[in-house]
């Protein structure tokens, strides 16, 4: 029996930030040694909302390069661009044809984003969860790393696989699609905004000061941390519900400095913010320096980056096409020799 397979990805819209790294990519790096790992840049999802076509290609390559710079190893995982594997779009259509409309209309993220877009909301945004289901189910993923905001989408993928495909077109002995399970991420999965300790750090936040991106220069990192929201109390502590910003910033320091929560809490127990913030800024700059240096090397060598992504695409296609063929057969499509 082979290693369990895991599939994950992130959109290329907006710059990747500390939350993406500490909450997701860092976990993917660890999974490479124990799991059959597929990681993709989900550029098809990026166009479900208004986007800038002049930036999409560069943003996609930048995101792929950051995966590699953060420690994803093409010798131990498959890194690819979603739109370069045609099976994603075809399986999405097949799943669309068996998925009830009301399943999609109840998705919380769709409701929230539809309010923002008003009459301009696209069918693609409504269908986003079905495309995500296709992404997952194509690779026979055993596990899918998910945060709180994606749990409902994974449940939909499981329901489509089990109730709409396997139950109708397969059998208990020979299911058409593997039903994935969620992989709960370890500590550090929720990095909060620098401007609101109760909100998750997000690429979509209009306030750029709310996040530290992986490519922010040292002076900008220092500036953002200096301006980060705090409280008037002296001394830093964890797990005080009345001090969410303190919990978030101290947690970042514990991770970025490598000291861990206990040592960080002891070190900062009597500190004021004027003493602590430079320490956090230095830790963030030092942690991101090797990532930024490696990213610069990769973006300067497009031939190598293209080679890695082409290899990942080929590996992904071999798995995805086999899964797609099973679904096509189960649904009764004709074959021509």
UniProtKB/Swiss-Prot annotation:
GO annotations of cellular component type: cytoplasm
Localization: Cytoplasm
InterPro entries: aa-tRNA-synth_Ic, Rossmann-like_a/b/a_fold, Trp-tRNA-ligase, Trp-tRNA-ligase_bac-type, Trp-tRNA_synthetase
GO molecular function: ATP binding; tryptophan-tRNA ligase activity
Motif residue range(s): 'KMSKS' region: 200-204
Pfam families: tRNA-synt_1b (PF00579)
UniProt-listed GO biological process terms: tryptophanyl-tRNA aminoacylation
Main location (coarse class): cytoplasm
Broad enzyme group: ligase
Short sequence motif named 'HIGH' region, residue ranges: 12-20
Sites where the protein binds L-tryptophan: 135
Binding-site positions, ATP: 11-13, 19-20, 147-149, 191, 200-204
Keyword presence, Protein biosynthesis: yes
Keywords, comma-separated and alphabetical: Aminoacyl-tRNA synthetase, ATP-binding, Cytoplasm, Ligase, Nucleotide-binding, Protein biosynthesis
Reaction catalysed by this enzyme: tRNA(Trp) + L-tryptophan + ATP = L-tryptophyl-tRNA(Trp) + AMP + diphosphate + H(+)
UniProt keyword annotation of Manganese present: no
Enzyme Commission no: 6.1.1.2
Highest taxon of source: Bacteria
Protein family (similarity comment): Belongs to the class-I aminoacyl-tRNA synthetase family.
Functional summary from the UniProt entry: Catalyzes the attachment of tryptophan to tRNA(Trp).
Subunit text: Homodimer.
Record protein name field: Tryptophan--tRNA ligase
Source species: Parasynechococcus marenigrum (strain WH8102)
């Amino acid at each position: 029996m082979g290693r369990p397979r895991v599939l994950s990805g992130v959109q290329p819209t907006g710059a990747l930030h500390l939350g993406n790294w500490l909450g997701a990519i860092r976990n993917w790096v660890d999974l490479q040694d124990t799991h059959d790992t597929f990681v993709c840049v989900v550029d098809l999802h990026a166009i479900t909302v208004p986007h800038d076509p002049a930036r999409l290609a560069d943003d996609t390559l930048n995101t792929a390069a950051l995966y590699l710079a953060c420690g994803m190893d093409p010798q131990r995982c498959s890194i690819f661009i979603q739109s370069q594997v045609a099976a994603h779009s075809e399986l999405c259509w097949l799943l669309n044809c068996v998925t009830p409309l009301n399943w999609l209309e109840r998705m919380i993220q769709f409701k929230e984003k539809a309010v923002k877009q008003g009459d301009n909301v696209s069918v693609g945004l409504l269908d986003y969860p079905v495309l995500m289901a296709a992404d997952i189910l194509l690779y026979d993923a055993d596990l899918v790393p998910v945060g709180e905001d994606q749990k409902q989408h994974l449940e939909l993928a499981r329901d489509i696989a089990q109730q709409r495909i396997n139950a109708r077109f397969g059998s208990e002995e020979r299911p058409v699609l593997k039903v994935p399970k969620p992989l709960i991420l370890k500590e550090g999965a929720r990095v909060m905004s620098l401007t609101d300790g109760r909100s998750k750090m997000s690429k979509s936040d209009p306030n750029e000061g709310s996040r530290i991106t992986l490519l922010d220069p040292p002076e900008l990192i220092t500036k953002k941390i200096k301006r980060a929201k705090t409280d008037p109390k002296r001394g830093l502590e964890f797990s005080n519900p009345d001090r969410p910003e303190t919990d978030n910033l101290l947690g970042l320091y514990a991770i970025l400095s490598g000291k861990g929560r206990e040592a960080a809490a002891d070190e900062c127990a009597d500190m004021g913010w004027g003493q602590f913030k430079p320490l956090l800024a230095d830790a963030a700059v030092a942690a991101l320096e090797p990532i930024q240096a490696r990213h610069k090397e990769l973006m300067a060598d497009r031939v190598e980056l293209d080679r890695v992504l082409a290899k990942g695409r080929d590996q992904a296609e071999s798995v995805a096409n086999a899964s797609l063929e099973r679904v096509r057969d189960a649904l009764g499509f004709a074959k021509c020799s």
